[in-house]
């Protein structure tokens, strides 16, 4: 019989388990914790910040704000209700949409409007592309 095998037979099971698990130490749990922290910082935290910003934006919508819905419909808020908004999309058409359907407010986000940008800079000649956008 092999001498190592005879020693294993004489060792109590508890000692054998302690020998095999004692080599792991604290490094693997620490590594898992670091990976979880990095995952939280790069995935969950930015998403939570974006949700808070969007909720604040939707909460502060007022009459006259130019908005864009998640479906891409552009309009101006004409009536503000508790859970919905009525937006005017043209001279004759209005839509009632849920507050959660608003993707952005054009004024507050700094989205430029080519027509007003061109009008606000007198003396600057329009290029061919600018003329197409300004129409």
UniProtKB/Swiss-Prot annotation:
Superkingdom field: Bacteria
Annotated localization: Cell inner membrane
Record-linked InterPro entries: Preprotein_translocase_YajC
TM helices/strands, residue ranges: 25-45
GO term, biological process aspect, one: protein transport
Primary subcellular site in the record, as a coarse category: membrane
Protein's membrane topology: Single-pass membrane protein
Cellular compartments per GO CC: plasma membrane
Chain intervals with Basic and acidic residues compositional bias: 108-120
SMART domains from the UniProt entry: YajC
Record text on subunit structure and interactions: Part of the SecDF-YidC-YajC translocase complex. The SecDF-YidC-YajC translocase forms a supercomplex with SecYEG, called the holo-translocon (HTL).
Known function: The SecYEG-SecDF-YajC-YidC holo-translocon (HTL) protein secretase/insertase is a supercomplex required for protein secretion, insertion of proteins into membranes, and assembly of membrane protein complexes. While the SecYEG complex is essential for assembly of a number of proteins and complexes, the SecDF-YajC-YidC subcomplex facilitates these functions.
Family recorded in the similarity comment: Belongs to the YajC family.
Stated name of the protein: Sec translocon accessory complex subunit YajC
Native source species: Treponema pallidum (strain Nichols)
């Amino acid at each position: 019989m092999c001498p190592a095998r005879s020693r294993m037979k004489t060792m109590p099971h508890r000692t054998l388990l302690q020998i095999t698990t004692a080599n792991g130490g604290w490094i693997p749990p620490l590594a898992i914790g670091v990976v979880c922290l990095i995952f939280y910082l790069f995935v969950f935290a930015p998403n939570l910040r974006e949700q808070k910003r969007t909720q604040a934006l939707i909460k502060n919508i007022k009459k006259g704000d130019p908005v864009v819905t998640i479906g891409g419909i552009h309009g101006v808020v004409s009536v503000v209700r508790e859970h919905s908004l009525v937006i005017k999309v043209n001279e004759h058409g209005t839509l009632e949409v849920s507050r959660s359907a608003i993707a952005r407010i054009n004024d507050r986000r700094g989205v430029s409007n080519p027509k007003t940008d061109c009008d606000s800079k007198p003396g600057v000649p329009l290029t061919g592309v600018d003329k197409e956008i300004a129409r």
